[in-house]
Amino acid sequence: MTSASFAFSPRVLDPLDPQVRPDPQGRFGPFGGRFVPETLMSALTELEEAFEHHWRDPDFRAEFHNLLRDFVGRPSPLYFAQRLTEYYGGPQIYLKREDLNHTGAHKINNALGQVLLAVRMGKRRIIAETGAGQHGVATATVCARFGLECVIYMGALDMERQAPNVQRMRLLGAEVRGVESGTRTLKDALSEAIRDWVTNVETTHYVIGTVAGPHPYPKLVRAFHDVIGQETRQQCQEKWGGLPDVLLACVGGGSNALGLFNEFVRDPQVRLIGIEAAGEGLHTPRHAATLNRGRIGVLHGAMSYLLQDEEGQVQEAHSISAGLDYPGVGPEHSYLKEIGRAEYYAVTDDEAVEALLLLSRLEGIIPALETAHALAYLKTLAPQQGLRPANAIGPQQRVVVNCSGRGDKDLNTVFKYLQQRGRSF
């Protein structure tokens, strides 16, 4: 891993700029690229060529969208959160209900797309990494649907935090391999999955679960999640005949956020806001706020912002949310930050838990802890109690929050967290 600094010239985002898409080398400005061992270069080239070919194939697209409808249950609703809106006194808050997808999160969009691609490529063995377990469950689910061998790598600490999802993966026929090295979390699971892929590249497809990793993964994962934003645009037109004012999503690696944002990048009047995990606070080393506190370097095959020390070594990330507990971020998020098209802030563990409790009690929806980070930022955006920070928005503006997953998997974590602080549900 290396670190570097770059000089950026201010510019307006050009939707025709090939760097945005990304460019042929897989770069978003200086970010992205392909920093991998020579043994993986041919596999990545094969994957890129297969994706470009099949994504243009009407039969592939039709099969993908039919399965999104009939197997995943799309489109997911755009729900007006009336009581949450009343609580904050405005803005008008809508939830994009990815938690209602089959398996309970946005992750299945990408898992389905990649496994379909792997089948077309003749791969019969699928591997994946997972943090919160939702990507692992989604991948295991799709592998069961297509009768493929499935191996999931998961940090041992995350297996403890997300035991229900470990059970689901095994029930679906996947082999779950615990990773004891390093911090025993998502970063280490991803590293182990890459090692497996290097060894078994001829027979195996690696389903990366976020918009990180070497090219073409950031591009293809975004493509499979684009359905989130495409549906949102249509639903906004149907509900009020216009665009949302703000899109709000949590950011770990950043796939759910880009799935929502990408459709609206060319609409400058729509604010794009990503929320990272501040953990125990940005003033402490225990956070996962890569875009807020990181520096540029290379991790897991791509250049992006990373949490790293002065020697360029990757630092340990912390979040109560296993899905945000990652010291890197997708390279396109780094690019959107640098050109000023998207804003990135962070909320703490405490704030996320309070947001989870609030939505549960006001709307009858238990969100994932990942989603709760985005929901927590509504307190800053909303003019509640006369507080109007500089980036607050008006009471008639419309905010769409990506409800990226449901919170069943997090109940034990939240209950333990509250108990340690002398509280209960």
Swiss-Prot record:
Query: Which function does this protein serve?
Result: The beta subunit is responsible for the synthesis of L-tryptophan from indole and L-serine.
Instruction: Name the keywords, alphabetized.
Output: Amino-acid biosynthesis, Aromatic amino acid biosynthesis, Lyase, Pyridoxal phosphate, Tryptophan biosynthesis
Subunit structure and binding partners: Tetramer of two alpha and two beta chains.
Any matching Pfam family:
PALP
Q: What class of enzyme is it?
A: lyase
Cite the InterPro entries for this sequence. Trp_synth_b_CS, Trp_synth_beta, Trp_synth_beta/beta-like, TrpB-like_PALP, TrpB-like_PALP_sf
One cellular-component annotation, GO: cytoplasm
Task: Locate the N6-(pyridoxal phosphate)lysine modifications and list their residues.
Answer: K107
Q: Which family does it belong to?
A: Belongs to the TrpB family.
**Enzyme Commission number(s) from the entry:** 4.2.1.20
Q: Name one GO molecular function term.
A: tryptophan synthase activity
Source organism per entry reads Synechococcus sp. (strain JA-2-3B'a(2-13))
Stretches assigned to coiled coil: none
Q: What name has this protein been given in UniProt?
A: Tryptophan synthase beta chain
Cofactor(s) needed: pyridoxal 5'-phosphate
Top-level lineage group = Bacteria
Position of the signal peptide: none
Q: In which pathway does it act?
A: Amino-acid biosynthesis; L-tryptophan biosynthesis; L-tryptophan from chorismate: step 5/5
Q: Which reaction does it catalyse?
A: (1S,2R)-1-C-(indol-3-yl)glycerol 3-phosphate + L-serine = D-glyceraldehyde 3-phosphate + L-tryptophan + H2O
